[in-house]
Amino acid sequence: MQLTALEIIRRESLQKLRELGINPYPAKEFKTTATIDEILTNFKKFEGKEVILAGRMMSRRVMGKASFSELKDASGRMQIYINRDELCETDDKTMYNSVFKKLLDMGDIIGVKGEVFKTKVGETSINLKELTLLSKSLRPLPVVKTDAEGNVHDAFSDAEQRYRQRYVDLIVNDHVKETFIKRTKITNAIREFFNSRGYLEVETPILQPIPGGAAAKPFITHHNALDIPLYLRIANELYLKRLIVGGFDAVYEFSKDFRNEGMDRTHNPEFTVMELYVAYKDYNWMMKMTEDLLEKVAKDSNGTTEVQIGENKVSFKAPYPRVPILEAIKTHTGFDVSGMNETELREVCEKVGIEVDETMGIGKMIDELFGEKCEHTYIQPTFITDYPKEMSPLTKEHRSNPALTERFELMVNGKELANAYSELNDPIDQKERFEEQLKLSEKGDDEAMFIDQDFIRALEYGMPPTSGIGIGIDRLVMFMTNSSSIQDVLFFPQMKPEKKAPSVELNDNEKALLKIIETNSPILLNDLKAH
């Protein structure tokens, strides 16, 4: 273990605190009476009154017998004024001269008791009367500075380091915490919208014997007791439909899904999807519901239906345009691909510069055409509708064109945000669609769907006409917070393995420090330096 000079000094301070009889990690509950935000927003209510706060010490300015510090709790930051003789009313000034001035460090978690007042310059502050150490910080925090123009410069701006050590990122970068607070507002808004309509929130299995409901590569594991392979779910769709078969009229779930595929700025192998299924509805009804839902989410999280996403101002105000996918492809490529066979589609793909191979069927090639040539052009919310049957094995056949299905995807800022259907409830048709997927799998398509015989059995008992939708929560949060990477809206995104420093032989100084930690024995910093 290699320690920096500052880390060694902090460990020495830890020992000195213990020698003074101060437990740096007390177990007893510390009862607070207010938060910083409550005091700042209701100063008149708290003025002149005694309060108890707890938080992290973020700065310290020592000015002889008086000092200033900044305390940060979960709600905000506030100045603490420390007068030596008010903190230490007896002749013993240890708490000020030794503990506060020398042994406490930036990042330490403390409890403070004092009166609320305003300084001569009008800053709301606490006049400290009692100080309690609640947790000693052994690593120094990165230093964050604001220049004269108000620009923030911090020593913790490396993206990879921020994602790995999100706990530090949250401490020093207040705007990061705001992103995750807004994420909760977004999911709360969705829950309120559904719960007000009587929809039931449910939970379905994460470990599944068959990974169904989407075209994606699953993660595979093994159950030792049952001696069977299991898969981390790629979607929860088929289980939610089983609940519709069972008699629920409307169910939804915020599900953690997993896909063993690539990682980029919009994809993480573990992600959150909200799926909703409502009986006796179709995809036209679902489009209207989606517009109403996203209007509410935008207003609740941003106070307006207009949201800045990168360079674009996007309006979530209904209604949204509806564009059939084959019309979109014709508009952006000049080719009418409706009715084309595999050979003809392959020729079109080659003409527009899209690589194809023999494993790709009609659905896959149409998906590639739209994704490469059309998707990025839809900045404002747009429903792309009426997908070919080959692309949608779980979707009901279109009521006026048997070659198409009643499916839509919602595009926002050039990306897919939601996917929805009039759900296929014909068990015979569903079995045939699964068998077509099996043929694609045999051709080498590793994203083709598995055949789920139990789901077919459930449909044979009868599922009412149903519409369902899946909304990518991580991507929705990216849009509503104007975040450019999915890693910015996940507390702990998946990362490549951290590079470890090469192992080194401990020197005498480090061995002595290791002994302190292992035996909890006191040793002076000067003794360490003597080594």
Give the positions of each predicted feature:
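Alpha-helix N-cap/N′ positions at the starts of helices
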Residues: 9, 508-512, 523
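Short capping segments at the starts of secondary-structure elements
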Residues: 518-524
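Class II aminoacyl-tRNA synthetase catalytic cores and aaRS-like
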Residues: 1-503, 524-525, 529-531
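Short alpha-helical segments that sit at the start of domains
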Residues: 499-513
